[in-house]
């Protein structure tokens, strides 16, 4: 009988079903879908950029649009913090302004205040002593004199610096990028150097045909040439001569190697870069729960170079994130990588611990453009990007995140890391133990991650014995490129098991930290923590407060905070309480039968219905706005 039970248990486990105690089971296995894309990857859907739209995969809402509407009767920005006792016309547009100038009129048309939230007063005002949303705040009565309509609190002259957020850039700095006034002097030089190396390689391959070309050149010289042709040839000769001079000057040097700030990732608790859900409030939450290192959402290099507002919002961080905050950049060419890194290093040098090149993103659109994991198919281009970034980034270290390869069954990371050691000066390499083709359909291959870590250490030893290594590291006995593993870490046993490998410096946690944000507390305690529904609700309250601190407490900020709250819930609800499980730990790819919690709130927190996520959001953000729209990633349900 015991064998039969064990066989049944193993059979269930093989099917990837989490074992829930019988008294909590209410139905068959739930239909939890495996994510084939990075979290929140709708930013990069083909349909948004024109051309043919992809076929929808596995019931995903690939073209969802969760942008929120703004106020119908919006208050003029010049009057948001105005003194109502002073009737001076603050707006230069006067009667031509499309916004409301009369504050009492605005307050009459404004949406009702939020009164039935767990926040009884404005959470931003409680934190800062003032509310930057002024009259637009949905908790206005907590910081406005009802009789005089005068705002309470002391307002600093520089609201941005007083918000406890870092990495802001000025409007003038953005205009320099938009108007192409930013000099990019370092980028221009390093790109010339890299071009000279490429041209020299091309010339070496053309040697076989040089005789034929010389004969043709002699015939052409006998013919009379137009002045414009002669001028172009002279310019080409000068350009080629400069390339040769640069090549001779730098060919025997590691010109890209620069002195950098120390980067220590050894056994650090690292949260992976996460598109959409890895926003500032979430990262700030993770810092309070034990994370040591956080990364921005993936920023695209070209919009950064162009000064796009939405892209420059991504490197912003809370002051609690630094040191230990990295900015991740995606690009397809060396000039994009170089100029984006130079702009970041010039404008926000004191708020970044590292700049990370994304060479692992599997999203189709970016892959077709040559970004993300497409760089795995072109290691030479990846190396040029890394070297250009390293040259221009000042003292900010450059790191790279890769996958095992692009095709399943054809891993290339073990050979790639050798080239990265010999041909670049990256401070750290993060390896996600899946190929691009796999996405999340199979478990991460940690045996291969371990194999790559050993290959990296062997490459470092070989490099130090080479003439190049002896010359460039003559004061050091060893070279250590930090190596971080990534994939399917969901509990403390996973963490410590992977760190038993001495060649692995640390582990990076992605979906595990979304489903279970207290995972680093478990790692420190070395226990499977059974969080109660009230404790999990407190985590959501903290996230909601951080969301309002960041996006604001006006109508638009509340809608935006609610939207990202629902994005967070799309992962957070997948947690299965330890107390209702037959066995622990549960693996990330295991799904439970339909279950009920130990109390009503626990059941609500585990619901996959978007309407229940909205219900939870109303506890913190007040009643849902009529215009609020949220479409989840999967087509199981939506809210309008």
From Swiss-Prot:
A Pfam family reported for this protein in Swiss-Prot or TrEMBL: zf-CCCH_4
Cellular component GO terms held in the UniProt record: cytoplasm; nuclear periphery
EC number: 1.3.1.89, 1.3.1.-
Database matches in InterPro entries: Aldolase_TIM, DUS-like_FMN-bd, tRNA_hU_synthase_CS, Znf-CCCH_4, Znf_CCCH
Enzyme class: oxidoreductase
Biased composition (Basic residues): 52-61
Compositionally biased intervals (Basic and acidic residues): 202-215, 222-236
Keywords in alphabetical order: Cytoplasm, Flavoprotein, FMN, Metal-binding, mRNA processing, NAD, NADP, Nucleus, Oxidoreductase, Repeat, tRNA processing, Zinc, Zinc-finger
One of the GO BP terms on file: mRNA processing
Active site: 361 (proton donor)
Family in the record: Belongs to the Dus family. Dus3 subfamily.
Protein name, as recorded: tRNA-dihydrouridine(47) synthase [NAD(P)(+)]
Native source species: Candida glabrata (strain ATCC 2001 / BCRC 20586 / JCM 3761 / NBRC 0622 / NRRL Y-65 / CBS 138) (Yeast)
């Amino acid at each position: 009988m015991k064998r039969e039970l064990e066989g049944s248990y193993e059979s269930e486990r093989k099917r990837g079903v989490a074992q829930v105690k019988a008294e909590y089971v209410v139905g068959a296995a739930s239909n939890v879908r495996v994510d084939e894309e990075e979290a929140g990857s709708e930013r990069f859907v083909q349909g948004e950029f024109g051309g043919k739209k992809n076929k929808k995969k596995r019931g995903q809402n690939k073209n969802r649009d969760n942008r929120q509407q703004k106020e119908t009767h919006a208050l003029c920005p010049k009057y948001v913090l105005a003194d109502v006792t002073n009737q001076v016309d603050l707006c230069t547009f006067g009667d031509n302004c499309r916004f409301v100038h009369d504050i009492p009129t605005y307050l009459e048309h404004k949406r009702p205040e939020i009164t039935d939230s767990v926040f009884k007063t404005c959470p931003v005002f409680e934190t800062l002593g003032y509310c930057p949303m002024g009259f637009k705040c949905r908790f206005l009565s907590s910081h406005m004199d009802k009789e005089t309509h005068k705002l309470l609190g002391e307002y600093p002259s520089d609201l941005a610096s007083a918000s406890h957020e870092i990495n802001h850039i000025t409007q003038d700095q953005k205009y320099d990028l938009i108007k192409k006034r930013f000099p990019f002097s370092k980028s221009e030089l390093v790109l010339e150097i890299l071009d000279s190396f490429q041209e020299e390689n091309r010339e070496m391959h053309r040697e076989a045909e040089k005789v034929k070309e010389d004969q043709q050149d002699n015939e052409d010289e006998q013919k009379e040439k137009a002045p414009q042709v002669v001028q172009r040839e002279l310019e080409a000769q000068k350009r080629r001569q400069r390339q040769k001079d640069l090549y001779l000057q730098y060919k025997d040097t590691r010109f890209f190697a620069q002195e950098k700030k120390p980067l220590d990732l050894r056994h650090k608790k690292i949260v992976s870069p996460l598109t959409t859900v890895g926003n500032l409030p979430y990262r700030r939450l993770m810092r309070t729960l034990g994370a040591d290192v956080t990364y921005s959402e993936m920023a695209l290099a070209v919009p950064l170079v162009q000064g796009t507002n939405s892209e420059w919002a991504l490197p912003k961080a809370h002051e609690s994130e630094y040191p230990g905050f990295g900015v991740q950049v995606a690009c397809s060419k060396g000039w994009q990588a170089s100029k984006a890194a130079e702009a970041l290093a010039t404008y926000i040098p004191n708020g970044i611990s590292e700049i990370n090149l994304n060479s692992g993103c599997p999203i189709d659109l970016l892959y077709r453009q040559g970004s993300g994991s497409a760089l795995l198919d072109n290691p030479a281009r990846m190396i040029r990007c890394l070297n250009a970034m390293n040259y221009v980034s000042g003292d900010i270290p450059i790191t790279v995140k890769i996958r095992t390869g692009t095709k399943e069954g054809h891993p290339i990371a073990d050979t790639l890391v050798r080239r990265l050691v010999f041909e670049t000066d990256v401070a750290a390499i993060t390896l996600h133990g899946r190929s691009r083709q796999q996405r999340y359909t199979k478990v991460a291959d940690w045996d291969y991650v371990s194999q790559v870590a050993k290959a990296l250490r062997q490459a470092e030893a070989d490099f130090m014995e080479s003439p190049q290594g002896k010359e460039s590291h003559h004061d050091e006995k060893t070279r250590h490129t930090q190596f971080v593993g990534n994939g399917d870490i969901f509990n403390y046993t996973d963490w410590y098991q992977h760190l038993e490998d001495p060649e692995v410096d640390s582990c990076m946690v992605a979906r595990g930290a979304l489903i279970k944000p207290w995972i680093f507390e478990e790692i420190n305690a070395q226990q499977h923590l059974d969080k109660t529904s009230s404790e999990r609700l407190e985590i959501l309250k903290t996230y909601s407060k951080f969301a309002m601190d960041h996006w604001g407490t006006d109508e638009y900020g509340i809608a935006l905070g609610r939207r990202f709250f629902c994005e967070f819930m799309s992962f957070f609800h997948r947690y299965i309480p330890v107390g209702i499980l037959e066995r622990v730990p549960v693996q990330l790819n295991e799904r439970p039968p339909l279950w009920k919690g130990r109390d009503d709130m626990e059941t609500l927190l585990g619901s996959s219905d978007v309407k229940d996520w909205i219900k939870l959001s109303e506890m913190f953000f007040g009643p849902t706005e009529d215009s609020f729209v949220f479409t989840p990633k999967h087509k199981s349900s939506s809210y309008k």
